[in-house]
Regions:
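Conserved, structured core segments of small domains
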Residues: 1-125
Length: 125
């Protein structure tokens, strides 16, 4: 079997789901982010409730404190829609963050959910 055939065989059942990564650079003035953090969190929660936010959160170097950098993964139909959502983030709208948008093709990985029937709660494992 050739290398190309092996690659095809290995990837034929993979997910191939297109998502968009919003990679936000560290803020030159992270202390200014605090004033806009409630609005940012409300915005992210609203995106989550709409079903377009896959995951989001701060980035830090080697366990150090967050410096204003962040990563947000969006489920949108296009890069243009993802860019529109990124531009509407209060941190970006107020000039506190710059970002880079990348298309991300999810091929492999896993997500675990645990449903507790006794209290009808769900946990992400």
């Amino acid at each position: 079997m050739s290398v190309d055939e092996r690659i095809t065989a290995l990837t034929q059942k993979m997910l191939r789901r297109k998502l968009y990564a919003v990679i936000s650079a560290a803020s030159p003035t992270p202390e200014k982010l605090k004033a806009f953090l409630p609005a940012h969190l409300e915005y992210m929660t609203a995106l989550e409730k709409r079903g377009v936010l896959f995951a989001s959160g701060p980035l830090a170097d080697g366990g150090g404190p967050p410096d204003g950098a962040g990563l947000t993964i969006l489920r949108t139909a296009s890069a243009a829609e993802a860019r529109e959502l990124a531009e509407a983030d209060p941190f970006v709208k107020n000039g506190l963050r710059k970002y880079e948008l990348k298309e991300w093709t999810v091929m492999e990985g896993s997500l675990g959910l645990r449903v507790n029937l006794s209290d009808q709660s769900i946990e992400v494992a």
